A protein has these predicted regions:
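Catalytic-site neighborhoods of secreted/periplasmic enzymes
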Residues: 53-146
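Active-site-proximal N-terminal segment of extracellular/periplasmic enzymes that hydrolyze or transfer
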Residues: 1-37, 46
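Conserved S-adenosyl-L-methionine
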Residues: 37-44, 88-94
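Residue-level signal for pocket-adjacent positions within structured domains
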Residues: 11, 34, 38, 51-52, ...
Length: 146
């Protein structure tokens, strides 16, 4: 058995061919939908990203009894249930909050995980703009990397 769970911030399903859109071409989503089960009666009760992810992974409504935060020790998450039944789970995410203090219990429930760096405030491969202390035309390094 293979299980793939896709979560996107700010992706409107009405812009996807599998949901009836005929003017935006999404061939990869169409092919994925042909081999997938769609949960089209699943609604998030909490729309901020971390609470919505907790709801989608556990089936528990988040904002009714708590605010933004990590998975709780009593949460039975979908990735953890699959993992405990010998189904390999892997998380690939650019959602930096999984790895920050206060949200760091989401990824531990998977067998393995990978963080795509560089989103939001993640300073990986980001340098503040540097200003040369002289006329830049006089610098030896002309490509702008100091």
């Amino acid at each position: 058995m293979k299980a793939v769970m896709l979560m996107f911030d700010s992706l409107n399903r009405e812009m996807l061919e599998p949901y009836g859109c005929d003017w935006v071409k999404t061939p990869n989503f169409r092919r994925l939908a042909e081999h997938s089960v769609c949960f089209d009666q699943c609604y998030a009760g909490s729309l901020p990203c971390m609470p919505a992810r907790r709801e989608l992974q556990t089936g528990r409504y988040n904002m009714l009894h708590r605010s933004w935060g990590p998975m709780e020790p009593f949460d039975d998450s979908m990735p953890e249930l699959l993992k405990n039944n010998n189904i390999y789970t892997h998380l690939i995410s650019d959602h930096v909050h999984y790895w920050e203090d206060g949200g760091a219990t989401y990824h531990y429930r998977y067998n393995s995980w990978e963080n795509i760096r560089g989103q939001e405030g993640d300073m990986w491969k980001c340098l503040p703009e540097l200003f040369a202390p002289c006329d830049e035309s006089k610098l030896q390094n002309k490509d702008g990397v100091y």
